[in-house]
């Protein structure tokens, strides 16, 4: 083929390709015009696709707004919880929650906490604790053995998950706390400040409502577990004064975070700290810590309707504080049983006549092991003894604070008793690490006679070195 023929051939090919492209373009144009001008369309809209998209977004906005309004109406329609039921029969305890926080914290960003508890809303139950404003692996964890600092806050997080920066919700700022839901919303109280000038801020529905100033200028403090409400009235026990001598305890009565009244401690209890409370049959029972003299636990019984109370000690000779002497043959109902040497640990009990259970560390000298003992009529019988028991944590494993809680919104004709145990790790007992933190195990009652198992923290301290 000579050069002229090559040029002609190339030109013909180009013309053919161009013609095909033009035909495709014309076909596309015709198709689009046909689609846009189909019968029944509103031809005044020059950009119907854009208009349809906008309408969809507007409709979604309306739907989301309606859902939000429905949720708000549901909250408004909720009523105050009333303590109308009694306790369910307790024959044993089943596992309810465990967060394995220290084990997971060996390789993840888990927050340093202590003084944990569990508390329920109508929709869910959550873990609570006082964080230290740092993670277990963080350098600021050095020194977290100290109870009171500007970096502590009451946080909550999903049941059985470890507390992290990502899943925790700050309820209020402070180094001592309590929190409870009245059926309509949650009240949280945090105490902060220096030892001689601390104050409490009362939050309701996530807003600050009231404040309480120190009255004895000696470490104003409160329950370190949930409070309980009846018909909107939520009593809370506060103490201000020496941990090893006469202190000034008051019971405050709140409604929607506002103070209705307060009264000084009455009855025969001599020293009150860190009360663990539960409610049933319109009454509230709080089992507390006598850090001054008693190895037996003081009890405050509160009438939230009359807004009055009385106090005594658990009569049973089964002593439940730690440290403590060996159990005597006869207990004391109105006086502390000596032997705890100006020390103690937060604890709890369910005092329900023949259905009574007491919790305590297995060790009489330290915070290790944990057991539940069925002691009928322990509140009133100074010779009552255990007839049944269940080990929760073996004595070879560390324990700590413990407290009561209940899901008052669960279905059924009785309240299921529940409790948690703090599993402390790190200092002071394990001083190869610089931090002090904990995990949580929680149990609830069963009418069945279930088997028992050991529920330790499970972290190996050598993995942190």
Feature roles, as predicted:
Residues 81-107:
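An edge-strand/N-cap motif at the start of beta-rich repeat modules
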Residues 152-158, 251:
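Beta-propeller blade signature
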Residues 4-42:
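Hydrophobic, helix-forming membrane-interacting segments
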Residues 108-117, 173-179, 183-189, 218-226, ...:
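Repeated scaffold domains used in trafficking and secretory/extracellular systems
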Residues 124-129, 185-187, 198-200, 233-236, ...:
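Entry beta-strands of beta-propeller and related beta-repeat scaffolds
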Residues 42-83, 90:
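Long, low-complexity intrinsically disordered regions enriched in small/polar
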Residues 39-41, 86, 118, 123, ...:
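Extracellular secreted precursors and ectodomains with disulfide-bonded cysteine-rich loops/domains
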């Amino acid at each position: 083929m000579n050069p002229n023929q090559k040029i002609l051939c190339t030109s013909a090919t180009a013309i053919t390709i161009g013609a095909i492209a033009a035909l495709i373009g014309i076909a596309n144009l015709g198709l689009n015009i046909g689609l846009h001008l189909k019968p029944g369309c509103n031809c005044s809209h020059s950009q119907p696709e854009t208009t349809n998209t906008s309408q969809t977004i507007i409709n979604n906005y309306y739907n989301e707004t309606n859902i939000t309004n429905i949720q708000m109406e549901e909250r408004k329609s909720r009523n105050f919880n009333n303590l109308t039921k009694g306790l369910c029969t307790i024959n044993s305890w089943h596992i309810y929650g465990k967060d394995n926080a220290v084990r997971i914290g060996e390789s993840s960003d888990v927050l340093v906490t202590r003084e944990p508890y569990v508390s329920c809303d109508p929709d869910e139950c959550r873990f609570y604790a006082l964080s230290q404003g740092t993670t277990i692996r963080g350098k600021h964890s050095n020194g977290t053995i100290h109870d009171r600092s500007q970096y502590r806050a009451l946080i909550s997080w999903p049941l059985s998950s470890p507390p992290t920066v990502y899943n925790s919700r700050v309820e209020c700022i402070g180094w001592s706390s309590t929190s409870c839901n009245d059926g309509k919303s949650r009240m949280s109280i945090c105490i902060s400040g220096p030892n001689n000038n601390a104050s409490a801020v009362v939050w309701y529905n996530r807003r600050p409502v009231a404040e309480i100033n120190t009255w004895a200028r000696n470490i104003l403090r409160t329950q370190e577990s949930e409070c309980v409400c009846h018909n909107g009235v939520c009593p809370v026990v506060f103490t201000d004064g020496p941990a090893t001598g006469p202190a000034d305890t008051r019971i405050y009565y709140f409604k929607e975070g506002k103070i209705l009244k307060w009264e000084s401690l009455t009855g025969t209890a001599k020293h009150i700290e860190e009360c663990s409370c539960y409610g049933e049959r319109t009454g509230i029972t709080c089992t507390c810590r006598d850090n001054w003299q008693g190895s037996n636990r003081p009890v405050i019984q509160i009438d939230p309707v009359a807004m009055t109370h009385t106090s005594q000690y658990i009569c049973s000779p089964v002593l439940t504080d730690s440290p403590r002497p060996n159990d005597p043959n006869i207990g004391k109902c109105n006086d502390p049983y000596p032997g705890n040497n100006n020390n103690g640990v937060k604890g709890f009990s369910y005092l329900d006549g023949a259905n009574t259970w007491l919790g305590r560390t297995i060790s009489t000298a330290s915070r290790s092991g944990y057991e539940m003992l069925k002691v009928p009529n322990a509140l009133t019988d100074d010779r009552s003894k255990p007839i049944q028991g269940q080990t929760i944590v073996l004595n070879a494993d560390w324990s700590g604070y413990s407290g009561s809680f209940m899901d008052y919104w669960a279905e059924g004709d009785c309240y299921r008793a529940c409790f948690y145990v703090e599993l402390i790790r790190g200092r002071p007992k394990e001083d190869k690490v610089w931090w002090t933190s904990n995990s949580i195990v929680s149990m609830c009652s069963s009418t069945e006679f279930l088997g028992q198992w050991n529920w330790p923290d499970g972290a190996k301290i050598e993995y942190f070195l």
